[in-house]
């Protein structure tokens, strides 16, 4: 398994775990709301139910975001070799190692720190289409591309 394949696999596992965790929380909340609806009445009860529904909506929204991120990562061809920065590129700069995918938490793999950035982010959009040796500047930080996989 190549380093880029390991990165993709790590992010897929991370996102799958988060999806399962959110689904469990949503299911748990729905069950609590259903149980509360059976036996209580009154203003406090209605307020509690409303709060549960709001929390459930927030969790559903977060779940949709994470599923969308996982769909982006799933579509990446980890075997593709890039000469220009594109979705799925692993970009080594003079400062950091970037994985062009979705905005995800940074990870440590094989003693390297990988920062996942989306192509739509300020840094990602500047990196897209660049080649070996090109430079980009974000917030007065200059990044020179040392390698692209």
PLM region spans:
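Non-DNA-binding regulatory cores of transcription-related proteins
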Residues: 79-137
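Alpha-helix boundary/capping detector
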Residues: 41, 48, 52-56, 85, ...
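Sparse recognition of residues in long alpha-helices and their boundaries
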Residues: 75, 148-149
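Conserved hydrophobic positions within beta-strands
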Residues: 135, 145-148
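Generic serine detector
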Residues: 9, 16, 27, 40, ...
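N-terminal intrinsically disordered, low-complexity, charge/repeat-rich segments that act as generic
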Residues: 1-76
């Amino acid at each position: 398994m190549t380093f880029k394949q390991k990165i993709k696999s790590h992010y897929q596992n991370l996102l799958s775990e988060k999806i399962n965790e959110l689904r469990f929380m949503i299911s748990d909340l729905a069950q609590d709301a259903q149980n509360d609806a059976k036996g209580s009445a009154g203003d406090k009860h209605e307020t509690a139910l409303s709060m549960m529904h709001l929390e459930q909506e927030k969790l559903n929204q977060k779940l949709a975001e994470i599923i969308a991120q996982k769909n982006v990562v799933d579509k990446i061809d980890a075997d593709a070799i890039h000469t220009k920065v594109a979705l799925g590129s692993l970009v080594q700069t003079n400062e950091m190692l970037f994985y062009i995918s979705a905005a995800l938490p940074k990870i440590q793999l094989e003693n390297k720190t990988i920062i996942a950035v989306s192509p739509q982010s300020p840094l990602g959009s500047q990196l897209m289409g660049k080649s070996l040796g090109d430079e980009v500047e974000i917030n007065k930080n200059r990044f020179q591309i040392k390698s692209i996989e």
